[in-house]
Curated annotation (Swiss-Prot):
This is Putative TrmH family tRNA/rRNA methyltransferase. CDD domains: SpoU-like_RlmB (cd18103). One of its GO terms (biological process) is RNA processing. Keywords: Methyltransferase, Transferase. The lineage of its organism: Bacteria, Bacillati, Bacillota, Bacilli, Bacillales.
Length: 248
């Protein structure tokens, strides 16, 4: 199986810290060592090979801004849904998962993972078809959060929603019409929040499975938000409802 390339100091640092299998770290020639001291120290501690390479090689591998650092790592693995449910049952307190219905932009997924980590979301569920996967671009956009938030890839979102309901989750769909203001969202239950695709929103089969619908009110001339922005607002609203000011 071919290595996956990740780039950027945050993504590489988190991959090392979390123990993700790393074949090699590539450092740009001439980069100031004080900028990557933590990466170099952790790599040495874990006996990871560090190789200095020309900037042109990093440019070729990354095809994106790389901050002078890249790593060749084992491909990202998806969490198993059944195992995920088993692990969640062992936790105390209310749970939150995101269901991304047809999201295709890797930058959006990376940004969502970053906010999911910040707000303590327990997992993110994506479908196997017509969806972004875990890639180098997602890893960099997540600034390392990809190492901390379980991503579950499933064949059938509608069936997965049924299983979540059987395990005590209430499912909230995001919808522009006939929906409750998200600021009135009740968060005193385990929640699965569905975010639709950038262009089409939720699919009908998924929408029909939702227990209720929430919307983000807008007063401007553009009547939609980027999927990662909408997801972030939802995640932080749940976080706000469950944590008092000053608690964290």
């Amino acid at each position: 199986m071919e290595d996956t390339v990740i780039v950027g100091r945050h993504a590489v640092r988190e991959a090392i810290i979390t123990g993700h299998p790393i074949n090699k770290i590539l450092i740009q020639e001439g980069i100031k060592k004080q900028q990557i001291n933590e990466i170099l120290k952790n790599a040495k501690d874990q006996k990871i090979i560090v190789q200095t390479v020309p900037k042109s090689k990093l440019d070729f591998l990354a095809n994106a801004p790389h901050q002078g650092v890249a790593a060749l790592i084992a491909p990202y693995e998806y969490a198993d849904f059944d195992q995920f449910l088993k692990q969640q049952k062992e936790k105390e307190g209310l749970l939150t998962v995101l269901i991304l219905d047809g999201l295709e932009d890797p930058h959006n997924l990376g940004s969502i993972l970053r906010t999911a980590d910040a707000t303590g979301v327990d997992g993110v569920i994506i479908p196997k078809r017509r969806s972004v996967t875990l890639t180098q671009t997602v890893a960099k956009a997540s600034t390392g959060a990809i190492e901390h938030v379980p991503v579950i890839r499933v064949t059938n979102l509608a069936k997965t929603i049924d299983e979540l309901k059987d395990n005590g989750f209430w499912v909230a769909g995001t919808e522009a019409n006939n929906a409750t203001d998200y600021r009135n969202l009740e968060a005193d239950m385990s929640l699965a929040i569905v975010i639709g695709s950038e262009g089409q929103g939720m699919s009908r089969l998924v929408s029909d499975k939702c227990d209720f619908y929430i919307k983000i009110p807008m007063v401007g001339h553009v009547n939609s938000l980027n999927a990662s922005v909408a997801a972030s607002l939802m995640m932080y609203e749940v976080f706000r409802k469950r944590h008092d000011v000053g608690e964290i």
